[in-house]
Amino acid sequence: MAIQQLPIELANQIAAGEVVERPSSVVKELVENALDAGATQLILDIEQGGSKRIRIRDNGGGIVKQELTLALSRHATSKIQSLDDLEHIGSLGFRGEALASISSVSRLRLISKPPEQEEAWQAWAEGRDMQVTVEPAAHPDGTTVDIQDLFFNTPARRKFLRTEKTEFSHIDEVIKRIALSRFEVGFQLNHNGKSVRAFPSAQTEKQQLQRLAKICGGGFAEQASAIDAVDGDFHLSGWLVPPEHCRHQGDIQHFFVNGRMMRDKLLSHAVRQAYEKYLPNERVPTFVLYFELPAEEVDVNVHPAKHEVRFHRQRQVHDFILTRIEQALNQLVAIENEQPAMSHQHSYSSQERSSGATSDPYRGASGASFLGERKASGSLLPNAARVPHGNAGAQLSTEPEAKLKAEQNWRVLSVFNDVYALIRNEYSLAWLNLAKVHTECVSKKLTQQLQDGLNGQPLLVPVAVSLANLPGPASQWPQQQLNQCGVVYKIQREQAIIEQMPEMLRQGNVVSGFTDLLTLLTEDAETDQLARWLAQFAGLESYSLTQAEHWLIQWRSQLAESADALQKLPLPGENNA
């Protein structure tokens, strides 16, 4: 057979075999493109595990009309232009293969509007023909990539896809990992029309810890200790879990190099070697780590999916990570082995916590020296005491006749089952239901805010819902009260176009939230009833030690006459009957 140049369509499908392994591969490539474009908010709509549809909307810089066709061709990119750029890659993508490869095995629509362009344009491409059609479209600033019928023209590839649940779980994992690398970006993940994940932009340390708890679990956020080590051009930061609290599965092992998620053997070996002398049998290292170094020190162009890298100074990188993690673990194990007296529950004074002053570079994720509170609180618990679950009255003694006052000098010892804080003062030991406190405090605040009107937040993309699916005729909707709740909408062609919602409803299912809110208002709900309903969306699934301390302060200041969230425990030596 004679040697000949492969047709472009065939070359693209061969490239797709390397880049597009499954729906999650498509999601990874498209999300990375959006982040490279400067997006701060992404909405992902997935259908049937990604095999039917993958739609990703962002508010990034967009693509001008003249470059839409070029964007769907191979080796076309705005990220590098020379060999020197390839040596200093600062973006997540750089090869210019993703869109061309994806469009060769799917039906692809690319819609984009840069801020400087007056109108939006869309480009279509479908399968092997790769014929690109460009036409006008309606779209806000940013880009939408709509992928339908993945592998429709390659049946052999399609039959290797797993079940819908399995494929979506891979997509979910990709989004969680990327969300850990870009705290400043908001992510909304929907599957078959239902909201599955909502990660608001996390700018503050508190918000970042909330995202960490959402992704890795409240237990990780509670147990993990922060590490921050620098040596010349090398910078290692993130969170480590002490050996005795590490997991049996390796599902929380996240390593990022210059913002890029990695599964690199060199890095994994360094972490395992640092843990091995402390790690109990059948447990594996548990961590979220970020390694930063100059771009010219690392080659990311060694793996089709960019999961692996090659370091120019491999030995130095390995030894730096190994020694810094070993130092951190030595300190953590030393702290775990201490048995501090009850009068020294907190390693930091309140003044030190507020100022952030510490000489320990391996500070706890909660802001206090790692695990001092948990070790001490363990010695305070009677054997019969357990975290309350609904009707735990047989194990917990409540004392309504000796009303527990919020103004007493309570302090947090630890957090159990993600929502119960173990607190004590000079006389008492008790559980504080953080979810109840959080909701009550927010409800009280919302009651006051509703009088003046809530500040709504515009939706990245307006949501349309048929009037037939909403209660009552639109002409009878309580317009003024909806505005007071921060809702902005317009009626257009038998649809309500929702443009703005209050913050606590914006992150979930917008249509469901709008419908329920409208129902409440048409039933003339009182302000306090409305506030309680809105407050339930503000609660968290899990609370860190820092958050527990915050809500303890809020409870003392705002709900000083309420002890409903408390359940008292007997102190050691007291009668537990």
Swiss-Prot record:
Residues 340-358 have a biased composition (Polar residues). The keyword DNA repair applies. InterPro entries: DNA_mismatch_repair_CS, DNA_mismatch_repair_MutL, DNA_mismatch_S5_2-like, HATPase_C_sf, MutL/Mlh/PMS, MutL/Mlh/Pms-like, MutL_C, MutL_C_regsub. One of its GO terms (biological process) is mismatch repair. Keywords: DNA damage, DNA repair. GO terms for cellular component: mismatch repair complex. The keyword DNA repair applies. GO terms for molecular function: ATP binding; ATP hydrolysis activity; ATP-dependent DNA damage sensor activity; mismatched DNA binding. Residues 340-368, 381-400 are annotated as: Disordered. Belongs to the DNA mismatch repair MutL/HexB family. This protein is involved in the repair of mismatches in DNA. It is required for dam-dependent methyl-directed DNA mismatch repair. May act as a 'molecular matchmaker', a protein that promotes the formation of a stable complex between two or more DNA-binding proteins in an ATP-dependent manner without itself being part of a final effector complex. This is DNA mismatch repair protein MutL.
